[in-house]
């Protein structure tokens, strides 16, 4: 049972891992394609904005009339102080912007004209201090095209610990597990506390002794009683008359051999019998 459950869980985890890797690779591919498309669109937009900016500069330089001031070269104006003043062109008044015309081709340089007739002497001029326009009324230059995206910044500091999340919902009740094996017998428990004293009983009724009834029927035969103790020996009886002579009995069995006796003393030497003498030795 457990082996089947573990195998099923392992197989499911393997398939989930494979699916996760596949979708991660697909997502990275889509993000790369999206990044390339965004970069192409930004380059197209940059080209359009650069072209528009060039056309605006050409229109401004072509439509704004040039004003010459003879005294400007000899009179020193006030210096610009601060960063609020811009270096844009002088403002034009009552000059509506016309529609942009098509850019023509460059013509050939013309021949230098003849020298003009000397003019009359002019009136002595006064020293004029040229005031710059009020910085608050300075012309706002149009914003340039957006630059390319900068490199990713460094990793920021670790944020504060967020608040604790809400407590999760109560899970469903699990299935009842199989009945376990019977455990070993535990040690005897300690004696319980004495129970409370019972309530007093109700008062009994006064009994009235009735008349004796008729004797009942004879009961069944009871089981045999236990064996009694042996009785006391009786007194010896009177001596009886002698009996008749009995016949001889059968011979008894042979008894066992007795223990060996002590060895006797050596007897005296007997006399020589009629033996011949032995011949002498030859060798």
From Swiss-Prot:
The lineage of its organism: Eukaryota, Metazoa, Ecdysozoa, Nematoda, Chromadorea. This is Cuticle collagen 49. Residues 90-283 are annotated as: Disordered. Pfam families: Col_cuticle_N, Collagen. GO terms for molecular function: structural constituent of cuticle. Residues 127-139, 244-257 have a biased composition (Basic and acidic residues). One of its GO terms (biological process) is collagen and cuticulin-based cuticle development. The gene is col-49. Residues 143-155 have a biased composition (Pro residues). Belongs to the cuticular collagen family. The keyword tRNA processing does not apply. Keywords: Disulfide bond, Repeat, Signal. InterPro entries: Col_cuticle_N, Collagen. Disruption phenotype: RNAi-mediated knockdown causes dumpy body shape. Defects in cuticle integrity.
